């Protein structure tokens, strides 16, 4: 990945220099469209690298990420803080009313200009250098946060050695847990914090103590006294985001983020959330009451429903009320069936054939 990423950076730098050094007056084609088409190789490589880092990472990829991410952050800053490049973008933007652009071109121009502004192009002097420093720092912090979360998730394992501990679990989940244990030369059944293991266990396992153990492990990730603790990292991320937002003239990071979203501001978000809260609360309270009643019928009137009980008893209630069990649906969503459905639909709608 590293040679390809470095080559991608080199290619995009050459493409950006070509835009800047173009002797012709800045226009949509030679500036906005040319900028949009730059960095094709880098985009392709970083997309693959990012997906692999998220879905199938290892120590080598994580070490490479620590090296590559600051380079990518620096490269991004070198583009958006390039005064000559922004001058050309701004020149085109300022004459947008006279360019007779179609809707797609107008949107592209608007996005390009706003992206430069949102990434510090209007900053000057010390403020510009401070923005560069803060964004580089934020890139490192967010990468560390993600890596800690991933490592903490990967290192946890709940190994069960007694068959009775598996009561309630579908056979396919039991088999998968046995395979996980076997892959590490262990006897028994290993359950992890990864969704394919965690979610079914919380939904079907009869053993409440084990549900609690797994739930607490999942919900206290990166808070323990070890090298993966993210508490201080989160504080630093929040503070750095606040500094970036205020440097760019916003009240806080929420305002900075929401400007380009449908909600536009924090007040709209809170208004919607409060409307939803008011609308959903009666239904949520009724559902909670039903789940609690079902649990108490099984466990006694003194039973108190806890977070690690919710998935288990709400699934039981769903099965009881609607006779729907997710395990009944599993054969319909087996990988090959899903592939047939998705690819078949693409062929039917768009005439695209996958082989």
Give residue spans per PLM region.
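Second-shell loop/turn segments in exported
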Residues: 2, 116-117, 197-204, 222-227, ...
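Active-site-adjacent "gating/activation" loops or surface patches in catalytic cores
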Residues: 183-221, 310, 322
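Membrane-entry segments of alpha-helical transmembrane domains in multi-pass membrane proteins
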Residues: 2, 27-33, 226-230, 269-276, ...
